[in-house]
């Protein structure tokens, strides 16, 4: 992986060794698939060798990126690796977080209610960067997001809309009265009061820096001035969290000497046929770091579908996707907004095609096969594990298994009176004997259950499907269909289809990408303008295109509200 080496741009081996009289900042620009994480890992190891394991601080926008770096077996303590919010939270002594304590606010402000956040989720960057056009929470959530955006861009209050200023005053009063800091305060107070980065590092690394807003990058740079040097790893072309206040300018300004900029130019993901349209698209933006960026040496394909829109994905789109899945390829379906994926999800469910979104595990709509104690797939596996057709790993039921799948059965005609109350009292790890079953089930239901063991495992699935309670009937259909069509292990196997918004899969890749070019009304208004609003839309679709390793399908737009790709 080579950077520019033409005498102007810097090279990876020079990091930390250049003249620091102007700045100690280095920037690594990593276009899609160029191995930014690999290079950053190498730089962290170099810094540890030079300064020691206690002299390095690594920060990233999200916990997912921090975890990816941590997974590279870095020679630093886990508490030196985390999101910027997490580092600030600990540096400020672990204050109470306002977004986690909104009960009083919701009582006093019924028209501006907020959804309480989980502290660790937000500190880990989990809900930062939810998609534009996604289903927002309550009215107060929207107001707080707007306020945080204006603050993050470091625009003085007199430049804010009046409604944001008014909300800001009430929110500040609430925080002061209850001794709380919100997530934006963590950065703002650290910028004001914490002069040196936590643990006094000699070298600071900021990954995913294009996702940080001006205030966050100002803090990194303030801390960086007191380090020997610091590295900002980013791709300004992938700045797509504009709704959190992230802008390319925050990364690109102030300018730094050319020999402090390193550009990773060789993509190991994007083939020529995808690279061409992606570059034509991104070159339309008004502000970017010019990059010499090369496709991987493979032709690939860019196919424009003549029919099949997000509202009618069944035939051309899903049929071709099935052909790719049969060849063992991974497939990703991407749209600008969550609502555009609803018809597709309905078709995937109807056809029993397993799908997930590993980048947004908290979204149940995109992850209907999530495992976990009490989840539908775990109950179905607990049911099937004793059947001779289960295959490897077949074993007799334990009382714990029995409790999982029997809990959702309807009582009438199936379970004896009081059976559900008995279930939790059985020792969970003991085998469920025929005597146990006889004590729980009505005779006819038990006979039908035992008969299923003489046939295919699907007959056991059908026995359960017909007897679950009405309250869970709808919920169990898709996982049951998956097990029926593909076998029990399909509930455990990682699905080869990913469904999500472009925002949700940033950093991800698949062999084949289906990209819906449609825009919401708001995004279309942005796209029709010039400058930053239009640029934000273009960058979003550039990110969508460049997830593809082999082939991208540009689907038919549903209307004229679309991006020209």
Where would I find each of the regions flagged by the language model?
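Core RecA-like ATPase module of SF1/SF2 helicases and allied nucleic-acid translocases
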Residues: 34, 63, 86, 272-275, ...
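P-loop NTPase Walker
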Residues: 1-97, 500, 505-506, 543-546
């Amino acid at each position: 992986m080579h950077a520019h080496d033409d005498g102007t741009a810097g090279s990876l081996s020079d990091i930390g060794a250049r003249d620091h009289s102007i700045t100690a900042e280095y920037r690594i620009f990593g276009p899609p698939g160029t191995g930014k994480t690999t290079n950053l890992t190498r730089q962290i190891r170099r810094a540890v060798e030079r300064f020691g394991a206690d002299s390095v601080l690594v920060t990233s926008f999200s916990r997912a990126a921090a975890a990816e770096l941590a997974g590279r077996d870095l020679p630093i303590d886990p508490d030196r690796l985390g999101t910027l919010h997490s580092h600030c939270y600990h540096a400020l002594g672990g204050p109470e977080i306002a977004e986690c304590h909104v009960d009083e606010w919701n009582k006093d402000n019924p028209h501006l209610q907020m959804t309480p956040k989980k502290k660790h989720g937000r500190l880990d960057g989990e809900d930062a960067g939810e998609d534009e056009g996604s289903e927002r929470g309550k009215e107060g959530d929207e107001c707080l997001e707007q306020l945080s955006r204006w603050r993050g861009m470091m625009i003085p209050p007199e430049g804010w809309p009046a409604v944001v200023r008014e909300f800001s005053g009430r929110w500040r009063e609430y925080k002061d009265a209850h001794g709380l800091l919100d997530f934006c305060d963590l950065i703002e107070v650290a910028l004001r009061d914490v002069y040196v980065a936590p643990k006094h590092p000699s070298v600071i690394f900021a990954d995913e820096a294009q996702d940080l807003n001006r205030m966050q990058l100002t803090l990194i740079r303030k801390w960086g001035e007191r380090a020997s040097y610091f590295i900002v790893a980013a791709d300004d072309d992938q700045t797509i969290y504009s709704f959190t206040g992230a802008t390319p300018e925050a990364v690109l300004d102030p300018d730094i000497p050319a020999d402090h900029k390193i550009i990773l130019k060789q993509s190991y993901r994007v083939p020529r046929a995808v690279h061409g349209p992606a570059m034509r698209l991104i070159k339309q933006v008004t502000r970017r770091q010019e990059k010499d960026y090369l496709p991987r040496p493979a032709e690939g394909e860019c196919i424009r579908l003549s029919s099949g829109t997000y509202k009618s994905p069944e035939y051309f789109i899903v049929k071709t996707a099935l052909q790719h899945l049969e060849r063992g390829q991974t497939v990703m379906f991407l749209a600008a907004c969550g609502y555009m994926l609803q018809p597709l999800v309905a078709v995937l469910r109807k056809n029993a095609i397993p799908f997930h979104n590993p980048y947004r595990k908290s979204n149940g709509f995109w992850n209907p096969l999530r495992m976990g104690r009490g989840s539908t797939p775990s109950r179905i596996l607990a049911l099937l594990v004793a059947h001779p057709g289960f295959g490897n790993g077949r074993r007799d039921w334990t009382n714990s298994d029995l409790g999982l799948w029997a809990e959702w059965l309807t009582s009438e005609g199936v379970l004896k009176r009081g059976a559900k109350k008995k279930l939790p009292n059985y020792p969970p790890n003991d085998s469920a004997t025929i005597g146990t079953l006889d004590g729980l089930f009505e005779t006819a239901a038990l006979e039908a259950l035992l008969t299923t063991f003489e046939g295919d495992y699907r007959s056991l699935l059908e026995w359960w499907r017909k007897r679950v309670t009405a309250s869970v009937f709808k919920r169990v259909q898709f996982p049951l269909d998956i097990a029926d069509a593909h076998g029990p292990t399909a509930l455990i196997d990682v699905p080869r289809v990913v469904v999500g918004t472009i925002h949700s899969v940033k950093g991800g890749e698949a062999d084949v990408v289906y990209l819906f070019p449609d825009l919401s009304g708001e995004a279309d208004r942005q796209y029709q303008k010039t400058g930053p609003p239009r640029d934000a839309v273009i960058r979003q679709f550039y990110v969508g295109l460049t997830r593809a390793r082999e082939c991208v399908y540009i689907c038919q737009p549903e209307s004229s509200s679309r991006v020209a790709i």
